[in-house]
Amino acid sequence: MEFNQDNRSFCTTVAVLDTVAEQLADVDLTLPDYCPDIEKILKCTLIPKIQTRTLSGGQLQIDGNCVVNVLYVDSIKKSIRCCEQSVNFSQSFSVKEAPDNPVILTRTKPEYINCRALSPRRLVMHGAFSLYAKVLSSAKTSIYSPPAENCLEAQLMNIKCASLTSLCQEQFSVVEEVSVGDKPVIESILSTDISVNITDTKAVTGKLMANGEINLKLLYITDVESGETGKLDYLLPFNQIIDCEGIDENTINCVSCDIMSYDIRLKNDVMSDKPLLLLDLKLCLTEEGYVIADENVVTDAYSVKCATQPAFTQLNIVSDLAKLNDSHIEKSSVAVDNGKISKVINISSNQITADYSCDDKGITVSGKVNICILAENEDKIPVFIERNIDYSHLMTSSSEYNCALYVEPRVASISYRLADDSTVEIRCEIKFAVSAAAKENIRAVSDVEIFEDKPVKPEECALTLYFAQAGESLWSIAKSHNTALDKLIEENSAAAQNEDISRMPVSYTHLRAHETLSDL
C-alpha cells in the first residue's frame, strides 16, 4: 500500500575524496657566486606551496612548488647565511563522483629531508612531504514522514537538526608593501613564519564578509659584512567578501582560512634608503553555513488495522554548532646536547600538528609543536637546536560538543629565558579556532511496509486489563496489542507515551467490526 507523504530532508557535507599522497623533492643546489662557502649546515627545511587546484573530468589536479631552504654557517665570517631553491610538483587524484560545486581542501606536511655536501658550494638534497586532499560536496538525507491518511501510529522524537544551506569557497590574494620602519635595514632574509587568523565574520543574503589578520615574522641579516641579524613581527589586517549561495543573517557559519602559497621579495623604496618587503599571499576561504530547525523524527510505527514491517536507518544529526576560540600556554625546557649557549638569536616554530578527541568534559586538542632555536655557543659560532614539544588542551565551554568540523591551531608567540648556560626555558602560546558540533546518531524509521492482506484480528472481548511489566511504556503496550496510542493515553490518564507505568494496570477498549478510530 502506498500513501501520500510530505518529503522532508536535511542537508549535510559528504567527502567524495579524502586521501593523501607522498611527494618527493630532489634538489641539486649550487651556491650563487655572491654566497660564501658552506662550513656547517644548520637546518634544511621543506616549504611546500600550492599554486593551483582544479577539478575537471573526474580528476583533481594539484600543482605547486616546494622551496628547499638551507640555513648554514659561512666559512669566512662564521655568520649565518641562507640559500634556497625551488622545485615544481604535480599530483592528480581520481574523483569518481565529481560534484557540480565542489569544495577542495588541501594541506601539506613536511616529512623528512636529507642533505649531503658534495663540496663547500654544492649540496644534494632528498626529501618528501605529504599532500592531503579532500573534496566536499552536499548531500540530502530524507526524513520519513507518516502518511497523511490516519492509518499509522507513529512514535515521534522532537530534535534539533542542523541543515547545510551554503557550501562555498573562494581563493584570493593579499598583496602588501611592508616597511621595516625604524628597524635595521633588511639585506637578506633568513627565515619566514606566516600565519592567518579569521577574527570576525558577518553574513547577509548571498554574501559573507570575513575579517582577519596575517602575522608575518622574519629573521633577516641587517649587515652582510658583520653578520648581524634583526627580527620583524608584522600584523596585517585584511577583509574579504565572497559570494555564498544560500547564506543569510540567520546562518551559523563555520569558516576556515588556509595559506596556499606566499612570496616575499625585497623592493627598492624611492622614498627611503631602506628596501620594502613585497608580500604576496594566496589565501583560500571556505564556508559551511547551517540553519538549525526543529524536526519530528519517526522512531517507530505500526498500523491498528494491518500487519506492518518498519525499516530502520541511522540518522546522523548535528543538533548544535559553535565557533570556539581559546588559547593555551605550553612550557618546556630545552637542554643543549653539547656545549653551552652564550646567546639566543631567534626562537620560532615552523610546524604545529593538531588532532582532537571528545569525552564527557568536552573537546581536547592535542599535537606537537616544532621548536627551532638559533643560538651562539661559547665560541660565538651559530648553532641550531630543534625539539618537538607535546601539548594537550581542553577547549573551554566545549562540554556540549562531541565533534569538530575544523581545528586550526597557530603559534601566537614564543618567549624564553636562559635557565643556565645549557638550558633554555620556553613559554609557547598556542591559539585555537575550533568549529565544534554536537552530533547524534538516531535510529529512525525510513519506511513502513503495510500488508493489507494481513488484517489485525479483532479482539473478542470489549475491554482488556493489562498489568505493565518493568520497563514497559504505553507505546510498547499499544504496539504489541495493535491499539490506538491516543485512546490508550486518554483511558489511562497517562501524561506521555513513555511514562514509566511499571506494575500499573492498563485498560483499553477494542474496535468492533463496524467501528473506526473516529467513532471511539
Go through the PLM ranges and name each one:
Residues 1-470, 475-493:
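C-terminal beta-sandwich interaction modules and adjacent acidic
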Residues 494-505:
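Short acidic, glycine/serine/threonine-rich helix-capping segments at coil-helix boundaries
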Residues 509-516:
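Conserved small/polar residues in nucleotide/adenosyl-binding loops
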